[in-house]
């Protein structure tokens, strides 16, 4: 018997897949140019809709309609580096090989987690990968034919970072390298959020906020001044402006802080932690909302490379990524960022 209910199929959007609530679907299509999506009364109809053209994606998507998880397609783009990453785990389950390096396989499924309580892993078969990612949020997974590329995906290594910043590796290191004799122990969480009153309507007003925990004088609360007044654009700008301020403080103030950005935008989290690594400048400029995306990625890369370059100077070894948090779930920092975003939108 066909499964009945409400099923929202996204054939073209930020994440293709099947969703069982409108809000989940909306997050994938709102503000996305040329989005293709449709509501169905049965899971089988929604699945059939996805089987039409324009369904392919290099990334998999973990959705919540009956536990459906879309299998990622292979990428043959290979990114090589000198050192192997430290922050990932190979398979340990009894159904999988204990060592990827000894496994007789040319297929690697890399799962990168953007939340602290879920471990990043690499699998050598789709079945185990699918079981691991099912019903999990805040993660991204991708298929590779090269183990180093799969590891790079998790560790955040990119061949394009310096090109995106329009600076050579040597110039960046010469300009921003700190003395290794100094250790900085202070850390700070920065919560970012966007808001849009009347989101999706012609009269919508959007704003963004960033809450610097323990440093209220640094908080950001501004209206979104350009482009479509969508919640998605406001969330992008919130993280972008927070990164801009973080960069200014890292490069101008004597006391350095290890900042950690937290946002409830899965799109921004996955873009910065995972997806931008396969984009060059031309690809970035072709993305929806590129007027905000390009500076967002450039600012993120600068901060990330700064911490990488000076990792021995920071207590947490310079670890920096965008952490996804569940929105409207009682997290005081996230609620404060939401308040600042709404305050900014009210000034539009």
From Swiss-Prot:
Residues where Mg(2+) 1 binds: 193, 235, 264
EC number: 3.1.26.4
Gene3D superfamilies, alphabetized: Ribonuclease H-like superfamily/Ribonuclease H, Ribonuclease H1, N-terminal domain
High-level lineage: Eukaryota, Fungi, Dikarya, Ascomycota, Saccharomycotina
Binding site for Mg(2+) 2: 193, 338
Originating species: Saccharomyces cerevisiae (strain ATCC 204508 / S288c)
Residue ranges, compositional bias (Polar residues): 54-65
InterPro entries: Ribosomal_bL9/RNase_H1_N (IPR009027), RNase_H (IPR050092), RNase_H1_euk (IPR017067), RNase_H1_N (IPR011320), RNase_H1_N_sf (IPR037056), RNaseH-like_sf (IPR012337), RNaseH_domain (IPR002156), RNaseH_sf (IPR036397)
Domain of life: Eukaryota
Enzyme class: hydrolase
Protein name: Ribonuclease H
GO biological process, one term: DNA replication, removal of RNA primer
């Amino acid at each position: 018997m066909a499964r009945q209910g409400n099923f929202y199929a996204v054939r073209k959007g930020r994440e293709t897949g099947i969703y069982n609530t409108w809000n989940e679907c909306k997050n994938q299509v709102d503000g996305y140019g040329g989005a293709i999506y449709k509501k169905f009364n049965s899971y089988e109809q929604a699945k059939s809709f996805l089987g039409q053209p324009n369904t392919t994606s290099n990334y998999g998507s973990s959705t919540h309609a009956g536990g459906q998880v879309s299998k990622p397609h292979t990428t043959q783009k290979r990114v090589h580096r000198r050192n192997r990453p430290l922050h990932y785990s190979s398979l340990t389950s009894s159904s999988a090989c204990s060592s990827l390096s000894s496994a007789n396989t040319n297929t690697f499924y890399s799962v990168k987690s953007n939340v602290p309580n879920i471990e990043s892993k690499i699998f050598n078969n789709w079945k185990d990968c699918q079981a691991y990612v099912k019903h999990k949020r805040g993660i991204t997974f991708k298929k590779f034919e090269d183990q180093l590329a799969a590891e790079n995906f998790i560790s955040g290594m990119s061949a394009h970072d310096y090109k995106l910043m329009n600076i050579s590796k040597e110039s960046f290191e010469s300009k921003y390298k700190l003395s290794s004799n100094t250790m900085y122990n202070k850390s700070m969480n920065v919560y970012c959020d966007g808001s849009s009153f009347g989101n999706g309507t012609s009269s919508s007003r959007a704003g963004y906020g960033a809450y610097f925990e323990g440093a209220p004088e640094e908080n950001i609360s501004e209206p979104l001044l350009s482009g479509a007044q969508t919640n998605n654009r406001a969330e992008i700008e919130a993280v972008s402006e927070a990164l801009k301020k973080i960069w200014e403080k890292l490069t101008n103030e004597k006391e350095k802080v290890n900042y950690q950005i937290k946002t409830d935008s899965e799109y921004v989290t996955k873009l910065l932690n995972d997806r931008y690594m396969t984009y060059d400048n031309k690809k970035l400029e072709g993305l929806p909302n590129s007027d905000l995306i390009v500076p967002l990625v450039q600012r993120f890369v600068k901060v990330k490379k700064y911490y990488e370059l000076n990792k021995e100077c920071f207590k947490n070894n310079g670890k920096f990524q965008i952490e996804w948090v569940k929105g409207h779930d009682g997290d005081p920092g996230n609620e404060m960022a939401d308040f600042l975003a709404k305050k900014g939108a009210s000034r539009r």
